């Protein structure tokens, strides 16, 4: 099944689905969602340098580990799982924004305006401009 929600992150989408139900049903919903959800894609559009628009995506693939996080009400750890889940096709929005900036598709200002953690993205961009390692800054588990 496909659905759309107005959220700006994969983690936010999972939380919004669960929060749509009364508190007394949320444990059951978490269990059902953990066993049925396959993935979440969050997207945003940015102005492209030179005209037009550029789509940036956050991708969550529901692996057994992510499924456990949903079931155990530990959705605050989803971003950490996504950061280490590139081999499964996962991508955080800020990583996508960084790649668009690096490829000179979007401006720094536009990338930072859509970033979930703009301070960390700004630090990463500064490091990349200096020619330093551009590895993502680890996501705190409380986000």
Language-model regions, residue ranges each:
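Short, flexible helix-loop junctions that flank or precede catalytic/ligand sites
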Residues: 1-143
